[in-house]
Amino acid sequence: MYAERSSNLSIHEFWRRKSSKYMKTIKSEHLFVNHTCWYEETPETKKRNRXHRHRSSVKSIQSLEPSVNGSDSFYASYVDGYDLKRKFIVVETLTSEKKSRNYWKLIWETNCRVIVRFDINDWKNCQYWLHNHISDYTEGEFNVWKKKTISHNYYTEILLTVANKKNGKSKQITHYEYHEHPDGKLPIESARFIFFLKMVNKSQENYNISASSSNKCARTPIVVHSVGRYERAISFCALDICLNQIRETKSVSVPSVLLKIKGQTQLDFFSFEEYLIINKILLHSKWALELKTEDDGKTSFFRSRVRKYCLIFKRASVF
């Protein structure tokens, strides 16, 4: 049963799943993901894993020095990429980055250079400190400066400098905040999200240029934080892994990817809504990715429609 539900599908098989049985298939996979406790679990190890399940947390955040602002506790876990170990750090249950000394300590000690933030609230009304006209602030031994803000229609890019007062050193960090909340219904939203993923990866690669090719661990992990919906951070990582799997193997298995992430994080339950969004974005990826298929004519037509749509509504094109 495990092999059947978690086996890889070729990209053509996956993209042809849009049929009368599509929702039934997705619901079955979703139940399987939520009721499987361990990645690559077998009936023989199921009982043992339930009793000895571990979490691959970055560190015990609660063991860090207490913050002057009171409680400063949250969970953070490494998540492997498709072919890169510890590519992401997923942050959970963090209420405020500004008031969290431990958050910036995590950023500093893991050598993070790219931060991705989601907020399910209306970002225009959000009181997030980076939206304000505050150019710098201090938390513990860390000084954080906003050097440049680049606003786009559906995301904001902020260049930060974080300085450590204890050793006098500083680091440049690129902070992305995604403003849209794709539901997978519109191909344009899916295309934008995929473009955003590719841009974040490019930014990380720029920081990793000097990394040794023999080192299979990310030198500068991407920190992903989602306010109000922890699952969105998980979806970001899952989509990145799935899209890389499609590029490299021309096949994909969403259940396998989520189960592996589940074994690395604090995730116990993944909503059907979020699982459906991942699958719909991947279904639309046939037009957003640069892949050679028999539908190349349709791909060209789709991209032309997207450009026209963006011109009419004065939005930035993803192509």
UniProtKB/Swiss-Prot annotation:
**Pfam families registered for this protein in UniProt:** Y_phosphatase (PF00102)
- InterPro entries attached here? Prot-tyrosine_phosphatase-like, Protein-Tyr_Phosphatase, PTP_cat, Tyr_Pase_cat
The coiled-coil regions, if any, are none
Signal peptide segment: none
Q: Mind telling me which residue stretches traverse the membrane in this protein? A: none
GO molecular function terms noted in the UniProt entry? protein tyrosine phosphatase activity
Annotated SUPFAM superfamilies: (Phosphotyrosine protein) phosphatases II (SSF52799)
Tyrosine-protein phosphatase domain span: 7-285
Superkingdom of this protein's organism: Viruses
Task: Name the chain's protein.
Answer: Tyrosine phosphatase-like protein N3
Q: Which organism is it from?
A: Microplitis demolitor bracovirus (isolate Webb) (MdBV)
- This chain is encoded by the gene named N7
